[in-house]
A protein has these predicted regions:
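Metal- and O2-centered redox machinery and metal/ROS homeostasis
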Residues: 1-215
């Protein structure tokens, strides 16, 4: 999310649009530090991960994904470049996982108030890079949850199961949309700033200490 204090970042490239792999690889490289920071905060791949810690992560994710996805769904122009935020919504999956894990009514859990503004198409795509990346990486996390906690798609792992067998297809479609829009340096750099901002806001929300539920 661009702000006056946002760090300078290298451009995703000059000249005409690159292919999807190039644009996504550049996004990944320029958000590497923020990505690693949130992974460290969550500890989902830890060999000492507990069910309580996993449930808390789902609560935090629900509180972030729901308001962010609501904003993304207002960017109607995303559908013109092949992205349907409603089809890609994950908040309903998080709500289902929480109910399965006996958290209670997810609708009463607090929502994050400091979320990305997504005030432009480029900012929306940068934000979605973080959310869609969670679905892509969720395939690895899903296997770890099964091995460590016995969590399956049906028993509280639907969010990280994500698109399942369609994960690769959905990621490629997202990459194609990003590439088709990233035709100027300004658009590409705005995507990077939005992705960095989204990672940071998510980490800040997940680092809060107060309990979200009594489960």
């Amino acid at each position: 999310m661009p702000t006056s204090s946002s760090p300078a970042v290298a451009s995703l490239g000059d000249g005409p649009q690159g292919d999807a792999k190039h644009v996504l690889a550049a996004l990944r490289e320029q958000t590497r530090d923020e990505h690693q920071a949130i992974e460290q905060t969550l500890g989902l791949m830890s060999e000492t991960l507990t069910l309580q810690a996993y449930r808390r992560t789902l609560e935090r994710f629900h509180g972030f994904w729901q308001p962010v996805e609501a904003r993304l769904q207002q960017r109607v122009e995303l559908r013109e470049i092949g992205i349907d935020p409603v089809e890609r919504a994950k908040a309903p999956l998080l709500a289902r996982d929480l109910r399965v894990l006996d958290v209670g009514n997810p609708a009463v859990l607090p929502l994050c108030r400091e979320v990305p503004l997504v005030a432009s198409t480029a900012a929306a795509l940068g934000c979605m890079y973080v959310l869609e990346g969670a679905s892509l990486g969720g395939q690895i996390i899903s296997r770890h949850l099964g091995a460590r906690l016995g969590i399956t798609r049906e028993s509280g792992g639907l969010f990280f199961h994500g698109y399942g067998e369609r994960t690769g297809e959905m990621w490629r479609a997202f990459g194609a949309a990003v590439s088709s829009f990233a035709v100027t340096t300004e658009a590409r750099d705005e995507m990077v700033q939005a992705a960095i901002g989204t990672f940071r806001l998510l980490r800040r929300w997940c680092e809060r200490d107060e309990p979200l539920s009594t489960a």
